[in-house]
Amino acid sequence: MNISFEKFLECLSIFMHSFFVLLMVVMCGAYMSFVERRLLALFQNRYGPNRVGWNGSLQLLADLIKIMFKEDWIPPFSDRYIFVLAPAIAFIISLMIIPVIPFTPSSVILHCNVGVLFFLMISALTVYSVLLAGWSSNNKYALIGAVRSIAQTLSYEVFLGLSLMGIVAKSGSFDLLNIVQDQKYLWNIVPQFLGFVVFFISGMALCHRHPFDQPESEQELVAGYHIEYSGMKFSLFFISEYISVISISSFMVTLFFGGWYGPWFPPVVWFIIKTFMIVLFFVLIRASLPRPRYDYVMLVGWKFLLPIALLNLLVTAGYILI
């Protein structure tokens, strides 16, 4: 009886820890929208949201109240059940990456020996939510946006995977903990700079972040695959995108910037600081670059990123053999 009770307490502790981490990630994803709006206003020399609360700090609460009172409309011409299911799938998949990220040596929800492969597998699953949303909406703009998203995601998934093979070969492991510990004295961004460039660009494409937001380009497709969504369903897609940005940034810190390693501050503080700096860089790129044509996006991937990723893998293999 004592053993079963101890197991129950252990399971309860794991559940509460996991719930707290996921809740914090969701809140960070939501607040990232506010931070992005304020930073874009700063870059563009204008005022951002500054009316609700001190300097607009309660703008997220105002947006939440507004969204809750919006009509939860389902188009009569759509496939009702798939239409409702798609945003929930997008939200769940965006959260599935978080458990394998090692924030500190002891703060990891799910220790996976093949964490890199798990990340690649989950990031490829995002196409299903987009496909279901575009198809079930029964709208030509939504379907075109979904097709664009699928082609872009599957293409850049190839470059993303190849950019990580150099790190896997260098550290000799798919385990994220081992990869971080391998960077104790030298971060991977130094020997794997080409891989970092490919990973960063591919990560932006997988998150559909500007300038890779072709699936939802307003000038061409109005809103892309979520054109028919409103209220909380649209919010799930919206928050999922920001959670994906945080996930990609966290993996970038884990793989290239030494994870939790850093002087003076506790490990988790260093991890948060590094992740936040990369997220800020995502916002800076959105404020700086125009949106290219869709065919240019695909051309850059297959004509430039693929050779760079293969060159990085070849150089890494030569370094290991020498």
Curated annotation (Swiss-Prot):
InterPro entries: NADH_UbQ_OxRdtase_su1/FPO, NADH_UbQ_OxRdtase_su1_CS. It comes from the Bacteria. It catalyses: a quinone + NADH + 5 H(+)(in) = a quinol + NAD(+) + 4 H(+)(out). It is a multi-pass membrane protein. Its EC number is 7.1.1.-. The keyword DNA-binding does not apply. Keywords: Cell inner membrane, Cell membrane, Membrane, NAD, Quinone, Translocase, Transmembrane, Transmembrane helix, Ubiquinone. Its main location: membrane. The chain crosses the membrane at residues 14-34, 81-101, 114-134, 149-169, 186-206, 237-257, 265-285, 302-322. GO terms for cellular component: plasma membrane. It is found in: Cell inner membrane. One of its GO terms (biological process) is aerobic respiration. The keyword NAD applies. GO terms for molecular function: NADH dehydrogenase activity; oxidoreductase activity, acting on NAD(P)H, quinone or similar compound as acceptor; quinone binding. Coiled coil: none annotated. PANTHER family: NADH DEHYDROGENASE SUBUNIT 1 (PTHR11432), NADH-UBIQUINONE OXIDOREDUCTASE CHAIN 1 (PTHR11432:SF3). NDH-1 shuttles electrons from NADH, via FMN and iron-sulfur (Fe-S) centers, to quinones in the respiratory chain. The immediate electron acceptor for the enzyme in this species is believed to be ubiquinone. Couples the redox reaction to proton translocation (for every two electrons transferred, four hydrogen ions are translocated across the cytoplasmic membrane), and thus conserves the redox energy in a proton gradient. This subunit may bind ubiquinone. NDH-1 is composed of 13 different subunits. Subunits NuoA, H, J, K, L, M, N constitute the membrane sector of the complex. Belongs to the complex I subunit 1 family. This is NADH-quinone oxidoreductase subunit H. It comes from Blochmanniella floridana. The gene is nuoH.
